[in-house]
């Protein structure tokens, strides 16, 4: 069992089970990730592994990162991510994490950036109820009160108001793996996943 892997969302389609029911699925291209650093409670205060993903030419990487990658014999990565692990001793610098570490039926936690939908009002963004549409009402889609007057005399931080909808970090829990292709480095997961095609997804195994 592996800690996790990073991949790119390909898109959605549907497959059919033995009973003929259509199941919506998402395809993820998960190229091998390399272990670039091993963190332990003794040295860093917690147990985790750092992996590199999205290969990049060394000429396009800063000198400090090049020195960091030389320790694990890496050819170069553009991005890095961490996965918490219970036993970091089982990993070695330079180890490759591939789709072969996952199995059909395994439940994983998928994190990505949701699709940005621009500026939106309260009803679309926060599911507020609208006001009366007739009988002389002038409050159709207004937000209503946003706080009291003299006390506190300000709008509390975090007040639900109109603003940027989407483009936020989103996590899908208990997403089930339905198919694993070791040759093509593809995972097929049940249901939808955050973001649009080519979005980077963090797939973490349930501990």
From Swiss-Prot:
Gene3D superfamilies: 3.30.160.810, Translation factors. GO terms for molecular function: rRNA binding; structural constituent of ribosome. SUPFAM superfamilies: Translation proteins. InterPro entries: Ribosomal_uL3, Ribosomal_uL3_bac/org-type, Transl_B-barrel_sf. Keywords: Chloroplast, Plastid, Ribonucleoprotein, Ribosomal protein, RNA-binding, rRNA-binding. Pfam families: Ribosomal_L3 (PF00297). Its main location: plastid. GO terms for biological process: translation. Residues 115-151 are annotated as: Disordered. PANTHER family: 50S RIBOSOMAL PROTEIN L3 (PTHR11229), LARGE RIBOSOMAL SUBUNIT PROTEIN UL3C (PTHR11229:SF16). Part of the 50S ribosomal subunit. One of the primary rRNA binding proteins, it binds directly near the 3'-end of the 23S rRNA, where it nucleates assembly of the 50S subunit. Belongs to the universal ribosomal protein uL3 family. This is Large ribosomal subunit protein uL3c.
């Amino acid at each position: 069992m592996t800690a996790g892997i990073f991949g790119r969302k390909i898109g959605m389609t549907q497959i059919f089970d033995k009973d003929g029911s259509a199941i919506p699925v998402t395809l993820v291209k998960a190229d091998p990730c390399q272990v670039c650093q091993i963190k332990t409670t003794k040295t860093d205060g917690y147990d985790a592994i750092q992996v590199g993903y999205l290969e990049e030419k060394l000429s396009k990487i800063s000198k400090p990162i090049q020195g960091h990658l030389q320790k694990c014999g890496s050819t170069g990565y553009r991005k890095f991510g961490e996965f918490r692990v219970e036993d970091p001793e089982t990993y070695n610098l330079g180890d490759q994490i591939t789709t072969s570490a996952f199995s059909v039926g395994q439940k994983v936690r998928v994190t990505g950036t949701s699709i940005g939908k621009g500026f939106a009002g309260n009803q679309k963004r926060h599911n507020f109820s609208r006001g009366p549409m007739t009988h002389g009402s002038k409050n159709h889609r207004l937000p209503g009160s946003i706080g009291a007057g003299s006390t506190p005399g300000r709008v509390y931080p975090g007040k639900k108001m109109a603003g940027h909808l989407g483009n936020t970090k989103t996590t899908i829990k208990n997403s089930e793996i339905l198919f694993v292709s070791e040759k093509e480095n593809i995972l097929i997961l049940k249901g939808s996943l955050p973001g649009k095609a080519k979005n980077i997804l963090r797939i973490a195994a349930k501990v």
